């Protein structure tokens, strides 16, 4: 089976997918399409959107749908309905933070960056810290001893927020340790080192 991930040459919505594939040892083609070139091929994609993941001949768009597809396929979605729902809930909580971050980045960076760092970011991180603590006291993965697709989403979110504010995790020891723990996984560590050396932008407008 061949896999391909198509996205812009940024981290954006595709980065948790890349991290999952890399850490799980799943070989894939990482196709980067310059934004200016996307206009002419936009109609090729469902909803006219990227990222797009190809599982053989199947085309899947919407980052959450891609992540859940991979989670079902590679057992990264919990062992039962209760665990699957818990992972989904955690994922949606991370997305709440990311939606607020994205709105600030693309719509009001100059005026809202400082209020976001001071008010919104710590409030959202506190929610995630509290939820992380409910399994194994937050000392392992979101589900406890089993990694899930949401762990890769959380890792990337924490990584991005530390670019915005390097001190944002100081009051959240469980999240800080989680980020360090996943970042030390050999395949993730190697991938992130290469990515950071290439200076791949986080967002499409260059702001981060």
From Swiss-Prot:
Positions that bind glutathione: 7, 42, 49-50, 62-63
Record keywords, A-Z: Transferase
GO CC, alphabetical: cytosol
Single GO MF descriptor: glutathione transferase activity
Enzyme kind, highest EC tier: transferase
Pfam families given in the database record: GST_C_3, GST_N
GO biological process: glutathione metabolic process
GST N-terminal domain boundaries: 1-78
Role description: Conjugation of reduced glutathione to a wide number of exogenous and endogenous hydrophobic electrophiles.
Family, as annotated: Belongs to the GST superfamily. Pi family.
Subunit structure: Homodimer.
Protein name as it appears in the record: Glutathione S-transferase
Species this chain originates from: Dirofilaria immitis (Canine heartworm)
